[in-house]
């Protein structure tokens, strides 16, 4: 199997060692073999959501981690939770930053859905998180029972209010044509967060 298109160039020239390139190809082969994907390798790479090691950081935090995607045991473009919570340097860095800095609230951005999620299982900061979600205008506000994500960990383990804003209406990756509308919808969010923290 060969990498084609701009992904191959990026992997070869800027990002991936030959071992990492082989890991990406192995993830694709494993997902094809288990019928998790039927798309071409190029499309698989275009839709890639995980880190370079094939761990989906949306599932790598210690919030009901044990029950996440238990049948997916190999690195993948999406959905693989890793070998243990915070197994990835990116997740560790975010957790360390939040724990070491004393955040009062966190807004977590994701791409796809045009909604705000504010809830999770065993949410220690439900009222505060819902108030923060309601303060951000222009989105539908939904509860969720998410697991393994940053918001879920913040609310369950760290005791910090948090929301996830899902930007964009198209499938991931969000089309560049949506960026102006996303910017207009979100340019006041930092001030909204600051006001929320100052008044709560």
Predicted regions mapped to residue ranges:
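Active-site/substrate-binding loop(s) of hydrolase catalytic cores
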Residues: 1-121, 126, 174
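Catalytic cores of secreted/periplasmic or lumenal enzymes
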Residues: 127-143
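Short C-terminal domain-edge/linker segments immediately following a structured domain
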Residues: 29-36, 136-141, 193-199
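Noncatalytic linker/hinge segments flanking ATPase motor cores
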Residues: 42-49, 146-154
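Active-site-adjacent mobile loop/cap segments within catalytic or ligand-binding domains
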Residues: 94, 100, 105-108, 113-124, ...
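Compositionally biased, low-complexity repeat tracts
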Residues: 50, 78, 134, 144-145
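Feature targets compositionally biased, intrinsically disordered low-complexity regions
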Residues: 4-7, 81, 137, 147-148, ...
């Amino acid at each position: 199997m060969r990498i084609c298109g701009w992904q191959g160039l990026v992997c070869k020239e800027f990002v991936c060692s030959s071992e990492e390139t082989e890991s990406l190809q192995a993830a694709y082969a494993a997902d094809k073999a288990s019928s998790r994907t039927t798309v071409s390798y190029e499309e698989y790479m275009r839709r890639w959501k995980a880190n370079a090691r094939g761990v989906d950081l949306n599932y790598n935090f210690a919030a009901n981690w044990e029950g996440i995607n238990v049948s997916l045991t190999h690195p993948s473009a999406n959905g693989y939770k890793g070998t243990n919570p915070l197994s990835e340097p990116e997740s560790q860095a975010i957790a360390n930053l939040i724990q070491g800095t004393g955040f009062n609230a966190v807004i977590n951005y994701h791409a796809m859905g045009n909604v705000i999620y504010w809830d999770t299982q065993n949410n220690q900061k439900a009222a505060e998180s819902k108030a923060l979600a309601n303060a951000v205008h222009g989105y539908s506000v939904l509860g969720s029972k998410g697991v393994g994500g940053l918001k879920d960990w913040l609310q369950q383990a760290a005791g910090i209010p948090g929301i996830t804003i899902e930007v964009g209406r198209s499938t991931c990756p969000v089309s560049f044509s949506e960026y102006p509308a996303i910017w207009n919808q979100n340019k006041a969010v930092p001030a909204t967060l600051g006001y929320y923290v100052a008044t709560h």
